[in-house]
Amino acid sequence: MSDCFYLFEVLDHLTLDRTPGPVPERVGGLVGLKLLHLHLHGLFRSQDLELGRDADTGGQTLYVLELARSLANRAEVAHVEVVTRLIQDRRVSLDYSKPLEPIAPCASIRRFSFGPRRYLRKEQLWPYLDELADQLVRHLRDSDNRPDWIHAHYADAGYVGALVSRRLGIPLAYTGHSLGREKLRRLLAAGGEHEQIEQNYSISRRIDAEELALAHSDLVITSTRQERDEQYARYGCFNPDHAEVVPPGVDSRRFHPQGNSDEFTEVSELLSSFLREPERPPLLAICRADRRKNIPALVEAFGRSAVLRQRHNLVLVLGNREDSRQMDRQQREVFQQIFDLVDRYDLYGSVAYPKHHRLDQVPAIYRWAAAQRGLFINPALTEPFGLTLLEAAASGLPMVATDDGGPREILSRCDNGLVVDVTDRESLQDGLERAGADRDRWRRWSDNGVEAVSRHYSWDAHVCGYLALMQERLKRSSTVTVSSQLLATPLGLSPFGSRLLLLDLDSSLEQPDLKDLQSLRQQLTAPSAQAAQTSFGITTGRPLGVARQRFSELHLPDPQVWITQAGTQIHYGEEEQADRFWQAQISVDWQRESVEQTLSDLGDHIKLQKPEHQGQFKVSYLLEQPGPSVLPLIRQRLRQSGLHARPQLRCHWFLDVLPMRASLSEAIRFLSLRWGLPLEHILVVASQQGDAELVQGLPAAVVTADHDPCLDGCRHQQRVYFANRSRLMGVLEGLQHYRFLNARSRLD
């Protein structure tokens, strides 16, 4: 037996421990938590946030920055790092191209470049998130300061956080901030077409990412009970035992009712060019120019009401804007609707929409509006929480807000205004008219808001509650620690050289041309391949025994690794030594019998394949009739049953249901982590439906000319080569392109 496989025997006798890991080291008698936050979209820096510049730079951006600052000031925290995207774009500040940026003595921003260099809106980031996940795993693997928690914010970060968490065994906390299912529900209720919603928002990918994040989360932090009990409850992978309500807080040093004449003068000058009678009580809205914020409905309600036009001004602080031609389409459409409504109802002199304001002016704007006995208005179609409501309330400004989501809970605690159905134009107009009609009630609401925010929504209370949860949950975290043990185990010998070529037995090696096969055989055994220390592996959906028999007919060199059963089994070399660590990792929450039972009544759509095609971690079906609706149906059924399983379709007819943590892509990353082989030195071949996941991220890939059309969407990936030839000839072309079997490869 070789030294390498003796090592396997030793490792296989190690305990596959899934008990919670050790709590962090103590600093000055207190636990020194190391926290990694993922905030991927928008424009994020340590100061002078460009809030409202676009739909992606809003309340979440401010919350993450303030949370990082506050956590860094706590003795219980050793370090806070916020991971975001590195952007190199002349349209935005050079600040966003700095790889590292300090926030505070114990907090920093770390930026990773993934996808194009230019600034992208969040819906365009999805194809590049696997690249970030691979980079982040590599960074943390090599770091001496691995975090105790990953906290992912929004669906995109949730997706990356889930991948990093399961690969490295780091507990994951997740905050959705807003949820895709709720957004879809609201947009459909407002008359939106599902196809158009999908095109604008990539809503299916977002919901899938949220389900993945929830499936891997040890802690889900929500802002309200309604968000926890109603919005998250619509997700099949949501476990209510993992959810805690920790309402965001308000910085009382910035948001308070005590104003001064200088700041009021500055605000008045900001608005003076718009308003004929600036002394009127304002109806104030502060938000991004986003469809979801529903500002045109507010303008229309104001324009239709003689009472409101006579009594109030309308002040819309919708972020900063420069040249409207540089705005994204959604922003332009929102502003155009506002301009059209102002013109239609002749609201000139009664509506203000300043082009610029500073972030430090926002508290003064609230106080100015309160001094004018105005109202704060939040007409959003959906509002997961509503941090601006707390800012307004802390400043003594009563409000009228949407009855969706967080505002209901905030106003029930604060008793400082009205909630209305903002989808009903008459209801919104009536609420605005009633709220401003009674001066004594306005005064009572103002006092109530200031007192309630101080009592229920202080920033200190938020941070204390947050840290208490982090420390308590860490002690009983159920995150699998197999990966953590592997990274801590000195492996020594590896079964691989410096590169690894993975060929698919079911496609590129299926019925190969004899000349092409001979060429591959010669290249794999050539001195140059030996000098390049190139290893060879086989991937297949078949069981190992069947795959070995088929492979023997090809007369190729023996592979160093077999990845079989659609990525659920890993075996090494001639001894066919199974990797028990991989089996232990993917077995978490896997319920094979429950999968079969859950799908047993779908006989009109699928039927079980023969027993020889089944596996311990794979349930295989044949489709009765291929079609685009089958995979979503299976996915929905599995989620509704609370099963941590993932369906995947290959060649339009073959459906496999695997554990949530298993796939060919994940198996490759497991090998990379276990044996220290860089992903950039692994070459995969793709051609079939279902291979799109395989070519994401850092591994190099060859897509043969006879590929399924679904792979055409991967042409933007930098490390994917689309060959001009089919099958094995296309593989040989790809090997030549990368010079993969040469001593000096393009990948080095």
Identify the role of each PLM range.
Residues 519-611, 706:
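Active-site phosphate-binding/coordination module
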Residues 152, 222-223, 401, 538, ...:
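Short beta-strand scaffold positions
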Residues 596-697:
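Conserved acidic, metal-coordinating active-site core of Asp-based
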Residues 497-515, 695:
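Asp-based phosphoryl-transfer active-site loop
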Residues 1-390, 394-478:
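Catalytic cores of nucleotide-sugar-dependent glycosyltransferases that transfer UDP/GDP/TDP-activated
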Residues 658, 665-748:
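Mg2+-dependent phosphoryl-transfer enzymes with acidic/Ser/Thr/Gly-rich catalytic loops
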Residues 451, 455, 459-505, 522-529:
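Non-catalytic pre-domain segments flanking phosphatase-related domains
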